Design a protein with these regions (language model features):
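A conserved short coil-to-beta-strand element within the FAD-binding core of flavoproteins
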Residues: 248-261
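N-terminal glycine-rich phosphate/pyrophosphate-binding loop and immediately adjacent elements
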Residues: 3-132
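General beta-strand structural signal in soluble alpha/beta enzymes
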Residues: 183-184, 248, 267
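Conserved small/polar residues in nucleotide/adenosyl-binding loops
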Residues: 1-5, 283-284
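Core beta-strand elements of the Rossmann-like FAD/NAD(P) dinucleotide-binding domain
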Residues: 268-277
C-alpha cells in the first residue's frame, strides 16, 4: 500500500489502477446502512510503522490513530470474566484476581516477546535476499542476517529457533497456568490464519501484535478515526500531493509482456497503460 507513495515522492510518475469505485483494498470504510459507516475488512492498526507515518506526513492528510483500549474475555461457561486493561497496574491486579502466579509471570512473558520481536523488527524494512543468487546485494544481505543470528550466542539462538517453530499453546504453557488467561493470550496467535493454537509455528504470530507501535507506544494497537478507510485516504492524499494519479473503476484485463518483461496492462475498456515498472497485486 505504501510503495506507490514513496515512488511518487522520489519523483516517479505513478498511476494507480483500482478496479473498485473506492480505494483501499482491505483498509476501507463502507456505508453499510444510511448514515452508518463500518470498517468492513481490516479492523485495527497494529503493524503500520511510525517512520512511514512521519515520512509521508499522514497526520497532515487527516490520519489520526486512537489507542485501542483492550478487550473483555469470558470463560466457556460464562462464570468468569477477564478484562484486558490498558493501565499496567490495573492489568496486573486483574490477572492476580485469577492467578497470582500468572500475574507475576506476565512481565517475563512480555519481556521475552519483546526480545524476539526486536530481532524481527530489524528486518521489516529490508529487502529479503535470494539465497540462490551471487549478486553482491543478496550476498551482503545474507551476511547481515547471519551476523544477527551469530551475535545471539548459542543459548539464545536455541531459544529463538524453539520459539519460531513451536505452537502458541506450548509457548503460553511455559508462562501461565490459568486456562482463561491462556485462551485470551492465545487468540492473537491464530488471528488471520487457518491454524489452531497447537499448530507448529503459531507462536511466531504472537509477535505480529507486539511489533507495531501507535504514537511511540510499542506493541500498542490503534483505531483510525473515521474507520480504517481513513488510512487509505491519507495515503491517497500523500500520493496526489507528489503528482501521483489514482484511477478507480479501472479493472485490468490483460498484462502486456514484451521480451520476457512486463511493460503495461490492458483495461477492461480496452485502454492500454504502459510503464517502465509495473507493480501488480492481481490474484491469479
Amino acid at each position: 500500500m505504501y510503495k506507490r507513495q514513496y515512488l511518487a515522492k522520489a519523483g516517479l510518475n505513478v498511476v494507480v489502477l483500482e478496479k473498485n469505485d473506492y480505494i483501499g483494498g482491505a483498509a476501507v470504510t463502507r456505508e453499510m446502512h444510511e448514515g452508518w459507516f463500518y470498517s468492513s475488512c481490516s479492523y485495527v492498526c497494529s503493524m503500520m510503522r511510525q517512520s512511514i507515518h512521519r515520512d509521508l506526513d499522514l497526520t497532515r492528510h487527516g490520519l489520526l490513530l486512537v489507542p485501542y483500549l483492550g478487550t473483555v474475555n469470558f470463560s466457556d461457561r460464562g462464570d468468569r470474566v477477564l478484562i484486558d486493561y490498558p493501565d499496567e497496574e490495573a492489568a496486573y491486579l486483574e490477572l492476580r484476581r485469577h492467578s497470582p502466579h500468572d500475574a507475576d509471570a506476565m512481565s517475563r512473558f512480555q519481556a521475552d516477546l519483546g526480545r524476539y520481536a526486536q530481532l524481527i523488527r530489524k528486518t521489516l524494512l529490508r529487502t529479503p535476499p535470494d539465497p540462490s543468487s551471487f549478486k553482491p546485494r543478496d550476498i551482503q544481505e545474507l551476511l547481515w542476517m547471519a551476523k544477527q543470528f551469530w551475535n545471539l550466542g548459542e543459548r539464545e539462538l536455541y531459544e529463538y529457533i524453539r520459539f519460531f517453530t513451536m505452537s502458541a499453546a506450548d509457548f503460553l504453557h511455559d508462562y501461565f497456568e490459568d486456562d482463561l488467561i491462556k485462551a485470551a493470550m492465545a487468540s492473537p496467535g491464530i488471528i488471520g490464519t487457518a491454524l489452531g493454537v497447537y499448530s507448529p509455528g503459531s507462536a511466531y504470530i504472537l509477535l505480529h501484535h507486539v511489533m507495531g507501535d501507535v504514537d511511540g507506544n510499542v506493541g500498542a494497537w490503534g483505531l483510525a478515526r473515521g474507520g480504517m478507510g481513513a488510512i487509505s485516504h491519507a495515503l491517497a492524499g500523500a500520493l496526489k500531493e507528489h503528482g501521483g494519479e489514482i484511477r478507480t473503476e479501472a479493472p485490468v484485463n490483460q498484462i502486456l509482456v514484451k521480451n520476457g518483461a512486463t511493460v503495461g496492462v490492458v483495461l477492461d475498456n480496452g485502454d492500454e497503460v504502459f510503464a517502465d515498472i509495473v507493480v501488480l497485486s492481481l490474484i491469479h
